[in-house]
C-alpha cells in the first residue's frame, strides 16, 4: 500500500528535493543515494576525530552528571520498587550491528508485554510505535522522559563506542526488519543521542518517511559543523521544550 505524507512540512521537503511530488510512491521506490564504502573512505579522518570527541565529552558528562544520575536512580527505584532503575534494550547500531542500549526506566516493568494491547492506538505510521499519553509511563517517568534525563545512561553507550553524541536514534530490531533499502542508509553511521529529527519543529507531526528522510539527509551532510549545530540546537530544544 502506497503511503503519501500529508504533514505541513511536506512542502518544505518538496522544495529541498527530499520528497517526490504528491502522488509519487515513497519508501521502497526512493533511490539509494549513498555508497557505503565510498562514504566511509571519504570520512575516515572525521570518524577518528569524532570518536575522540565522543570519549572526551562522554567521560566529562558522566563525571559532571553523576549526582543527577544517582538521584534519578533513587527516584525511579522509589517509584517502581523491585524494578531496576536502569534497563537495557537490544538496538541496531551502525551497519546493522546489535548492541544493548541503556536508559533510566520511565515505564512500568512489564511495558513490553503490554505493547500488543496498545498497538491499535499507535500515533506514528510505519514500524515505529509512538503514543503521546502512553499509560505505561510512570510518574517519575513522565518527568525524566520530558527532560531527556532518561537518556543519560546512553553516555555509557557512547563511551563504549556503540553510539555517538550525534547520529540517528538507534532503532529496534523489529523496526529495522521492515526497513526499505532507502531507509537502511541511516544505518551507515553510528547512532546517536540526537539528529535532525530530534531538533525539527513539531517533530511529532512528521511522518515516519519524513523522519527517515531527515536521517538519510544527515548521513549525506554530516560534518563537524553540522554535528555542533545539532548539539547546540538539542540543548536549546531540551531547555525550552522545542521540537514537540
Predicted regions and their residues:
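N-terminal hydrophobic signal-anchor/signal peptide
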Residues: 1-63, 184, 218-220, 242-244
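Cytosol-/stroma-facing membrane-proximal "stalk/adaptor" domains immediately downstream
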Residues: 2, 177, 181-191, 195-230, ...
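Short, glycine-rich, amphipathic interfacial segments at transmembrane boundaries or analogous
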Residues: 22, 26-29, 86-135, 194-213
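A hydrophobic, helix-centered structural microdomain
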Residues: 41-111, 230-244
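An acidic site on a long C-lobe helix of protein kinase domains
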Residues: 48-51, 136, 148-151, 224-227
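Acidic active-site catalytic centers that drive phospho-/nucleotidyl reactions
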Residues: 54, 150-157, 215, 227
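Residue-level signal for cytosolic alpha-helical hairpin/rod architecture
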Residues: 56, 137-140, 213
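A short, structured surface patch at a secondary-structure boundary
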Residues: 124-190, 231-234, 238
